């Protein structure tokens, strides 16, 4: 039997957890179809989109283990319409259809579950592992607030003025900062 899996998401931006999910799906299934949620869905979920749908589709298409990327009607905040479309295209005598979720969504309730059960679409939870490797929302938040990772910890620009920046530094236990000399700026430190 030919095995097809449908995955869906905003992928805004794609991160290593998504890549693990795609590779895991490609290892287990003959065909990987990725449904790309709309800009409107991202706005409903996150307030706005980071990348356009065309850019996200271009990135996903370039990932070698994905066979096709599809846009679909997600006005009900689910990918049921995509599943319905793919289900209608396949030969049920020769093909088994699966709906997959990443590791961070394993064994939970989700909008598509009842539809899948009614249509005989099998569910594969936990693709790519069962721990959340990253978050598109965290990536965007860290980028927008200016979080910079360092070997000793990280710093965040809390407030920026024309001639001054206020930074919060988090030094990991057992680590120390490097000594630096600045010719064009002064630093004041408040330690708590």
Task: Please describe what each predicted stretch is.
Residues 184-192:
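Glycine- and acidic-residue-biased ligand/ion/polar-headgroup-sensing regions
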Residues 141-178:
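A short, N-terminal "cap"/entry segment at the start of jelly-roll beta-barrel domains
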Residues 112, 168, 187-188:
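Acidic-residue sensor for enzyme active/binding pockets
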Residues 1-147:
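Nucleotidyltransferase catalytic core that binds NTPs
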Residues 37-39, 169-174, 182-184:
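Histidine- and/or cysteine-centered catalytic micro-motif in compact active-site loops
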Residues 9, 165-166, 186:
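Short loop/turn microsegments at loop-to-beta-strand junctions
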Residues 134, 161-163, 183:
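A generic fold-level signal
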């Amino acid at each position: 039997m030919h095995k097809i899996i449908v995955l869906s998401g905003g992928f805004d931006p794609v991160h290593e957890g998504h890549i693990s999910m795609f590779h895991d799906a490609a290892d287990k299934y003959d065909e990987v179809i990725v449904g790309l949620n709309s800009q409107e869905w991202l706005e409903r979920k996150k307030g706005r989109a980071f990348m356009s749908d065309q850019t996200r589709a271009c990135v996903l298409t370039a990932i070698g283990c994905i066979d096709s990327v599809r846009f679909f009607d997600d006005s009900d905040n689910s990918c049921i319409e995509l599943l319905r479309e793919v289900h209608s295209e396949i030969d049920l005598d020769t093909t088994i259809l699966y709906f997959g979720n990443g590791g961070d969504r394993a064994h939970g309730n989700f909008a598509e579950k009842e539809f899948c059960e009614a249509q005989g679409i099998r569910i594969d939870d936990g693709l790519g592992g069962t721990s959340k490797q990253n978050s598109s929302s965290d990536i965007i938040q860290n980028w927008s607030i200016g979080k910079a990772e360092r070997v000793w910890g990280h710093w965040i620009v809390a407030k920026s003025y024309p001639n001054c920046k206020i930074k919060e530094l988090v030094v990991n236990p057992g680590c120390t900062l490097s000594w630096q000399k600045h010719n064009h700026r002064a630093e004041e430190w408040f330690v708590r």
